[in-house]
Amino acid sequence: MVRFTSFTSPFSAILLLSFGINKVATASTNTCVVAKSDSDDAITILEAFEKCKTGGTVVFPKDSTYNLNSIVTTSGLKNVNINLAGTINLPVREESYRNGDYYIQIKGTNIKMYGGGTINGNGQAWWDALDRTAPSVLRIAANDSSFGNFNIINSPRAHLNVTNSTNLLLHDFIIHTVSNNSNPAKNTDALDLYHSSGVIFRDSDLTIGDDCLAVKENVTKVTVSNITCRGGHGYSIGSLGMGGRRDFVTQVNVYNSTCIDCQNGVRVKTWAGGKGFVEDINFTDIYLEKAENPIIITTHYCDKNEMGYCNNNYETSLDIAGVHFKNIHGSGSDKGKPIINLNCSTESPCSDVTLTNINISKASNNTKNVCVNLKGSDKIPECSS
């Protein structure tokens, strides 16, 4: 049951996104406080969204806890505020959720989600079962919208999955997903981006088991800043081109961010045989601490969970051009990997790749830097060290 009230706000709340002047959320005319259900709080959550889907505010009150036993799918939201001040617990692992896309979907235009609350993914059972088929926690498909100032913990897979979105601000997240035993929290990306344009991700603290950022197929105009990531797989473009797919990523700027004890630091990864292009990528002012692979481009990425798409055709992949690494500093790990590993394809070599002011301390066993099929590598000092 939803407690439903009406009021007239004296003003409109307008958020000016730094990539434009788009309005995010407007004055609400209705407030829907999500009630508790006797069986499945997904039912009352959906009821609240239905009543307040146009010009309303959906409220999860502070100190309230909601337990889901089914998927929450919203669509057609317009001018909606979501005040998540309470806690949402996702379902425990069940066969019916395997290979699902998401647990919660928020879809619409001019949405603002905030509140300081928490979504708990209950991921431990998935990690203990070594099951990597869990859904993402939160899928966002939204235009001219803002999501932030709430927490996501114990995600069974990706925390934030953004698709088919434009002019989107993601900010002030605390994301914390760590296993309580020896079974690692694998495939728990903080943010996956697909088919989107004009996305800002900033001012967030991440402790995860996979990519801090994964900019995937058909994405353009992304800005990432002031992120601290711990224990993850770094800031990644890709993976792209799996199974010969045609993908593109352009105009991505990642700056003023940190990766501590990360497997990778800053990375571009594409599959052999993939088609499309990657261009205008900038990693600037990045601090890496004990990164196993601090700076890496690979055009023959292979995920051992997708071996059917792995092949030995290293001759072609996506065209990679205009990737710039600037002011990257910190330290490499003692795993014996090269500090810089730029390994491109024979028939589609990388071009216009620059390394400027790279200052990453080596361990005693770091191997020589790698620059393969990289146009202009003879003019890059790091390629000869």
UniProtKB/Swiss-Prot annotation:
Keyword Glycoprotein applies: yes
Recorded GO MF terms: galacturan 1,4-alpha-galacturonidase activity; polygalacturonase activity; rhamnogalacturonan alpha-L-rhamnopyranosyl-(1->4)-alpha-D-galactopyranosyluronide lyase activity
Taxonomy, superkingdom: Eukaryota
UniProt PTM: N-glycosylated.
Keywords of the record: Cell wall biogenesis/degradation, Disulfide bond, Glycoprotein, Glycosidase, Hydrolase, Repeat, Secreted, Signal
Enzyme Commission identifier(s): 3.2.1.67
Compartments, as annotated in UniProt: Secreted
A biological process from GO: carbohydrate metabolic process
Disulfide bonds: C212-C229, C344-C350
Catalytic reaction(s) noted: [(1->4)-alpha-D-galacturonosyl](n) + H2O = alpha-D-galacturonate + [(1->4)-alpha-D-galacturonosyl](n-1)
Activity sensitivity to pH: Optimum pH is 4.0.
Mapped PbH1 repeat ranges: 165-195, 219-241, 249-270, 278-299, 350-376
Residues forming the catalytic site: D210 (proton donor), H233
Cellular compartments per GO CC: extracellular region
Temperature-dependent activity: Optimum temperature is 30 degrees Celsius.
Sugar-modified residues: N143, N161, N164, N180, N218, N226, N256, N282, N343, N359, N365
Signal peptide extent: 1-26
Function: Specific in hydrolyzing the terminal glycosidic bond of polygalacturonic acid and oligogalacturonates.
Family named by the database record: Belongs to the glycosyl hydrolase 28 family.
Protein name in UniProt: Exopolygalacturonase rpg16
Organism this protein belongs to: Rhizopus delemar (strain RA 99-880 / ATCC MYA-4621 / FGSC 9543 / NRRL 43880)
